[in-house]
Curated annotation (Swiss-Prot):
PANTHER family: PROTEIN ADENYLYLTRANSFERASE SELO, MITOCHONDRIAL (PTHR32057:SF14)
Protein's recorded name: Protein nucleotidyltransferase YdiU
Protein's organism: Burkholderia lata (strain ATCC 17760 / DSM 23089 / LMG 22485 / NCIMB 9086 / R18194 / 383)
Family: Belongs to the SELO family.
Keywords: ATP-binding, Magnesium, Manganese, Metal-binding, Nucleotide-binding, Nucleotidyltransferase, Transferase
Catalytic activity entry: L-seryl-[protein] + ATP = 3-O-(5'-adenylyl)-L-seryl-[protein] + diphosphate; L-threonyl-[protein] + ATP = 3-O-(5'-adenylyl)-L-threonyl-[protein] + diphosphate; L-tyrosyl-[protein] + ATP = O-(5'-adenylyl)-L-tyrosyl-[protein] + diphosphate; L-histidyl-[protein] + UTP = N(tele)-(5'-uridylyl)-L-histidyl-[protein] + diphosphate
Gene: ydiU
EC supergroup of this enzyme: transferase
Pfam families on file: SelO (PF02696)
EC number: 2.7.7.-, 2.7.7.108
UniProt-annotated binding residues for ATP: 109, 111-112, 132, 144-145, 195, 202, 281
Length: 522
């Protein structure tokens, strides 16, 4: 679509958009029934205003970018009632359960999020739009149902940054702010971020109906996911086992991509794991700066359960939880009358699927690391070479992003060109030893230095959403200056490009960044 529509066209689009969202499509999650969700209006947000907006996501949703300039836009995406909203439309909060920090937490659910409807994208797919921070729901527990400005800006920026890194993720259309106060560790202001995804179904949705002994509803949910998102599973001998396998493999691929860019999710509870294998629920996340394999980005994670090095193991464990939830459905097609025999067969089949996680994750990460090192040919020693680099980085706390980006400057034949990356290491001798191994490996490659460097720069980002960059944007936004949110969003849309005018955004973090902490309080 063209971005040439006028503001008047955008004004005409608002009521059409609201009407579209109010008409659920056949097969939409909301049509599953009351056991899956509660329908309720959002809590009004006082005097809302636009903080951030993604024209790219608007384009995906077949909306003109000028729509954000319309007064009714902020009202609509704050969840406030508007004259354009259909009288019979009602957002919903879904119910799910889950394991949090490895402990069964029981019923959870959308405690501060409401899905307001679906819209067909320009790619032909159906996308759900969800307002995070839209007020209390029956699943809020002790929370107030609100999100604060800082966490909403972080989610908005990281959703789009991850997309442009090529990592599967929910998207973000807009952040709507308000001066309405909310109490966290201190008084903050409210905000609502509009998340966009084909589905917000989590592992925890399946755990909920399993734990409540409702195999009928569990099957209804699984059928919904298969028919809408994994139609190939319907053709398998056991569709539900195929669903487990598809979700497991996608999760393995996703976490391999996280590891390759130094991304830490921070709170990999089973209710924060997407059945589609996309990154969801950006809370206390972080990109590793000074590399530490044991890096913990979430201040609330006192045990280090979700540390960088633990993410693959935790993702695998979460898939076990999903498998347990799906056990009542696995093997139904086999016609085994004896329940115990069927259950035993289901466990064996599920275990065989779960064993594929490391088989998928390992090679996926090796391929990513080989590309990051600029290696076209496969050698058995490549994994050892990559691991040795990470060990050397860990020992020197070398910056993760800059190390991989600057590796492109290394020459096959000229060690003097090592200086930009070498300077990132405290132990220069250790780096030199590794660089010699690397140069020996490069001698087996056919590409010249320039071609290899170009390929490496296409997979090693120069710009990532470092915590201090987000913090600067947040501080300015609190003063009603949203220009840094927009500037940072624009930079992160081109993470692999040289942007000479924005070199400061690719620099090492300032000293004050070391004192920044992010937690589950948002």
């Amino acid at each position: 679509m063209s971005f040439s529509r006028s503001a008047a066209d955008a004004a005409d689009t608002l009521p059409d958009l609201a009407a579209t969202l109010g008409e659920p499509a056949v097969g939409a999650f909301v049509t599953l029934g009351d056991a899956f969700h509660t329908r309720l209006p959002a809590a009004p947000l006082a005097a809302p205003y636009v903080v951030g907006f993604s024209g790219e996501v608007a384009q995906l949703l077949d909306l003109p970018p000028s729509i954000a300039a319309q007064p009714g836009f902020a009202e609509l995406f704050a969840g406030n009632p508007t004259r354009d909203w259909p009288a019979n439309a009602m957002p919903y909060a879904s119910v799910y359960s889950g394991h949090q920090f490895g402990v069964w937490a029981g019923q959870l659910g959308d405690g501060r999020a409401l899905t307001i409807g679906e819209r067909t994208g320009t790619d032909g797919r159906r996308y759900e739009l969800q307002l995070k921070g839209s007020g209390r729901t029956p699943y809020s527990r002790m929370g107030d149902g609100r999100a604060v400005l800082r966490s909403s800006i972080r989610e908005f920026l990281c959703s789009e940054a991850m997309h442009h890194l090529g990592i599967p993720t929910t998207r973000a259309l807009t952040v709507i702010g308000s001066d309405q106060p909310v109490v966290r560790e201190e008084i903050e202001t409210s905000a609502v971020v509009t998340r966009v995804s084909e589905s917000f179904v989590r592992f925890g949705h399946f755990e909920h109906f399993f734990s409540n002994d409702r195999p009928d509803l569990l099957r209804q949910l699984a059928d919904h996911v298969i028919d809408r998102f994994y139609p190939e599973c319907r053709r398998a001998d056991d569709p539900y086992l195929a669903l487990l396998e598809a979700a497991t493999l996608r999760t393995a691929d996703l976490v391999a991509q996280w590891q390759a860019v130094g991304f830490c999710h921070g709170v990999m509870n089973t209710d924060n794991m997407s059945i589609l294998g996309v990154t969801i629920d950006y809370g206390p996340f972080g990109f590793v700066d000074a590399f530490d394999a044991n890096h913990i980005c979430n201040h609330s994670d006192t045990s280090g359960r979700y540390a960088y090095r633990m993410q693959p193991r935790i993702a695998h464990w979460n898939c076990y939880c999903l498998a347990q939830a799906l056990l009542p459905l696995i093997g139904l097609q086999h016609g085994i009358d004896d329940d115990d025999a069927r259950a035993e067969r289901a466990v064996e089949d599920a275990q065989a699927v779960l064993a594929k996680f490391p088989e998928r994750f390992g090679p996926a990460l090796e391929r990513a690391m080989r590309a990051k090192l600029g290696l076209e040919l496969e050698r058995e020693s490549d994994a050892e070479l990559a691991n040795k680099l990470l060990e050397t980085m860990h020992a020197s706390h070398a910056d993760f992003t800059l190390t991989f980006r600057r590796l492109a400057q290394i020459s096959k034949h000229d060690a003097s060109r090592d200086a930009p990356v070498r300077d990132l290491f405290i132990d220069r001798d250790a780096f030199d030893a590794w660089a010699n191994l690397y140069r020996a490996r490069l001698s087996e490659e056919t590409r010249d230095d320039a071609a290899r460097a170009a390929a490496m720069n296409r997979v090693n980002p120069k710009y990532v959403l470092r915590n201090h960059l987000a913090e600067v944007a947040i501080r300015r936004a609190k003063e009603k200056d949203f220009s840094e949110v927009e500037r940072l969003a624009q930079i992160l849309r081109r993470p692999f490009d040289e942007q000479p005018e924005h070199e400061a955004y690719a620099a090492l973090p300032p000293d004050w960044a070391g004192s920044l902490e992010v937690s589950c309080s948002s």
